[in-house]
From Swiss-Prot:
One Gene Ontology term, aspect cellular component: cytoplasm
Cross-referenced HAMAP family: KDO8P_synth
Keywords linked to the UniProt accession: Cytoplasm, Lipopolysaccharide biosynthesis, Transferase
UniProt KW Cytoplasm keyword: yes
Highest taxon of the lineage: Bacteria
GO molecular function, a single term: 3-deoxy-8-phosphooctulonate synthase activity
Signal peptide from the UniProt entry: none
UniProt name for this protein: 2-dehydro-3-deoxyphosphooctonate aldolase
Predominant localisation class: cytoplasm
Top enzyme category: transferase
Catalytically driven reaction(s): D-arabinose 5-phosphate + phosphoenolpyruvate + H2O = 3-deoxy-alpha-D-manno-2-octulosonate-8-phosphate + phosphate
Organism field: Shewanella pealeana (strain ATCC 700345 / ANG-SQ1)
GO biological process: keto-3-deoxy-D-manno-octulosonic acid biosynthetic process
Length: 282
C-alpha cells in the first residue's frame, strides 16, 4: 500500500508526512471573531511549524433545534473567508450541504467538506467531485470504516481522487460517540490521508435535549490517542469563550490553550513518525 499525497499549495497531506492542522471555529459567528480566531491559529501554527488550513462553517444546516443559530449564510460567509484568506494567506476548508453550493464555494475555498450525515448522498458527492477541489469526507457515525471505500469509489467515478477521510466518532447507544482507533488504522489502509476530528468526537449528540453536549475536559486525551496512530491531519475547533459559543461550545478547545495543546500533538506526531513500521501480520 502506498500513501497518497495531496498537494495544497506548499502543503503535502499524507499519512506519513508531518500532520496538517485543520482548525478554526465551528460556525462563523461574526467577521471580527473569525478574524481573531484565524489570527491566533496562524500565529501559533507558524511558531510551531505546523502546516495549517483555516476551518469554519457558513451554515450549520443540521442543528438539533430549528431555533438554533445556523450562521451568516453562504454569501456573507464567503466574503469573510475571502478576507481571512487574503489577510493571513491561509488555505480554507468549509462544508457544503446542497448541490448548488458546491461551485461558488470552490471558487473561494481550497478544501470542501462532505458532512457525515450527507456522506451517502450521491448527487452531492458528484457535484463536489466536479469542482476539482480537495475533498474531506466526514465518516458517518453509522458507517463501518471499511464502508468508506464505497464513498471513495463514488468520488473516483465522478472524476475526483483528491480525497481525505475524516474520523469523528461512531454512535454508541443513544447520545454518545466513541472513537475506534483501529478503525482509523483500517481507513489508512486505503492509502488516502486520514484526518482525526478530535473536536466532534467529543460530542454527546442531543445530550442537552435541543443541542449537542460534549466532553471538552477530555479533548487532550482523545487527541493524543489519535495522534499516536500516525495520521495525515488533526481537525480541531477552538473558541475564546466556549461556554458562550453559538454552536458546539461543549466540545471546543479554549483558544488560549491552543499553543500548549498543539505543542503536545506535534511532539507525538514527530515521535511516532520517526519509528520504523513493524509488520506484526507476519
Amino acid at each position: 500500500m502506498s500513501n497518497k499525497i495531496i498537494s495544497l499549495g506548499s502543503i503535502e497531506i499524507a499519512n506519513d508526512k508531518p500532520f496538517v492542522l485543520f482548525g478554526g471555529m465551528n460556525v462563523l459567528e461574526s467577521r471580527d471573531l473569525a478574524m481573531q480566531i484565524a489570527e491566533t491559529y496562524a500565529e501559533v501554527t507558524q511558531k510551531l511549524g505546523i502546516p495549517y488550513v483555516f476551518k469554519a462553517s457558513f451554515d450549520k444546516a443540521n442543528r438539533s433545534s430549528v431555533n438554533s443559530y445556523r450562521g451568516p449564510g453562504m454569501e456573507e460567509g464567503l466574503k469573510i473567508f475571502e478576507e481571512i484568506k487574503s489577510t493571513f494567506n491561509l488555505p480554507l476548508i468549509t462544508d457544503v450541504h446542497e448541490v448548488h453550493q458546491c461551485a461558488p464555494v470552490a471558487e473561494v475555498v481550497d478544501v470542501i467538506q462532505l458532512p457525515a450525515f450527507l456522506a451517502r448522498q450521491t448527487d452531492l458527492v458528484v457535484a463536489m467531485a466536479k469542482t476539482g477541489a480537495i475533498i474531506n469526507v466526514k465518516k458517518p457515525q453509522f458507517l463501518a470504516p471499511h464502508e468508506m471505500r464505497h464513498i471513495i469509489t463514488k468520488f473516483n467515478e465522478a472524476g475526483n481522487d483528491e480525497i481525505m477521510l475524516c474520523e469523528r466518532g461512531s454512535s454508541f447507544g443513544y447520545n454518545n460517540l466513541v472513537v475506534d482507533m483501529l478503525g482509523m488504522d483500517e481507513m489508512k489502509q486505503t492509502g488516502y490521508p486520514v484526518i482525526f476530528d478530535a473536536t466532534h468526537a467529543l460530542q454527546r449528540p442531543g445530550g442537552r435535549s435541543d443541542s449537542a453536549g460534549g466532553r471538552r475536559a477530555q479533548a487532550t486525551e482523545l487527541a493524543r490517542s489519535g495522534m499516536a496512530l500516525g495520521l495525515a491531519g488533526l481537525f480541531i475547533e477552538a473558541h475564546p469563550d466556549p461556554d458562550n459559543a453559538k454552536c458546539d461550545g461543549p466540545c471546543a478547545l479554549p483558544l488560549h490553550q491552543l499553543e500548549n495543546y498543539l505543542t503536545q500533538m506535534k511532539a507525538i506526531d514527530d515521535l511516532v513518525k520517526s519509528f520504523e513500521p513493524i509488520d506484526t501480520s507476519k
